[in-house]
Amino acid sequence: MIEFGNFYQLIAKNHLSHWLEILPAQIAAWQREQQHGLFKQWSNAVEFLPEITPWRLDLLHSVTAESEAPLSEGQLKRIDTLLRNLMPWRKGPFSLYGVNIDTEWRSDWKWERVLPHLSDLTGRTILDVGCGSGYHLWRMIGAGAHLAVGIDPTQLFLCQFEAVRKLLGNDQRAHLLPLGIEQLPALKAFDTVFSMGVLYHRRSPLEHLWQLKDQLVNEGELVLETLVVDGDENTVLVPGDRYAQMRNVYFIPSAPALKKWLEKCGLIDVRIADVCVTTTEEQRRTEWMVTESLADFLDPNDHSKTVEGYPAPLRAVLIARKP
């Protein structure tokens, strides 16, 4: 059973304590009414994993845990089998005692692009919106964060996160809650807020930016990573039925237009930190994610276009500050 009591106890003692006015009731409602049909199967996989305290833990350069003595073949097979019960693994990679989860996305590449542009994360309380399996939460802890909180309503991601946490010695510095951003009150409590790979899925992108701003302390930093297109500050692509085979893509602005949106929401010191083409080396099918991936979503004769004829995925990182 996945429980949230440790998180409640943790925030009861800090500046997130006011969240407890609504959070336990939201989680209780989720447990009672909203659990996925496969959730018990996934949570059983987590329960059957051994809780191991790593002899060596590297969260600075990767998410890697090692034991002092190699695990037995039987132990490794058990861990491998249980983790495969949580497929597909989209965000990673993870190296856990010799079990290497080669995820669809090389999320470590994204982190290496983003990290040089961030304010020092040492001692910070961080929110990661749409955090997936929580890979970047662990990298934030590795970069010195005091507490990293992720929210993502996808319940498989919650189970993947809890599986990794258990294999990292039940580390309590990172937490994932099965919520969407619209379920959060204006907490105004996080030093840094990340939203990576979320904005283009929102029907109202400016509302999403306001929601992110409402989670920041004054002088807090927003890190926004999203799909963009080439163009000036007035350029926005509104795809038809699908973009790269995704149905739920609503608005893809240019990076200059996105900068303008952030400024319109009252954020300051907005800068375009990085713009990068997504390659089929960064997002691809693996043995841990065996269905279609980016190569299947691009025009087979012209990888500069999606199968629908739109510009191929281009991603930008923008950094802004709340005054």
Curated annotation (Swiss-Prot):
One of its GO terms (biological process) is tRNA wobble uridine modification. Catalyzes carboxymethyl transfer from carboxy-S-adenosyl-L-methionine (Cx-SAM) to 5-hydroxyuridine (ho5U) to form 5-carboxymethoxyuridine (cmo5U) at position 34 in tRNAs. It comes from Salmonella arizonae (strain ATCC BAA-731 / CDC346-86 / RSK2980). One of its GO terms (molecular function) is transferase activity, transferring alkyl or aryl (other than methyl) groups. Belongs to the class I-like SAM-binding methyltransferase superfamily. CmoB family. Homotetramer. The keyword Transferase applies. Disulfide bonds: none annotated. HAMAP family: tRNA_carboxymethyltr_CmoB. The keyword tRNA processing applies. Its EC number is 2.5.1.-. Keywords: Transferase, tRNA processing. Pfam families: Methyltransf_9. This is tRNA U34 carboxymethyltransferase. Carboxy-S-adenosyl-L-methionine binds at K91, W105, K110, G130, D152, P153, T154, I181, E182, M196, Y200, R315. It catalyses: carboxy-S-adenosyl-L-methionine + 5-hydroxyuridine(34) in tRNA = 5-carboxymethoxyuridine(34) in tRNA + S-adenosyl-L-homocysteine + H(+).
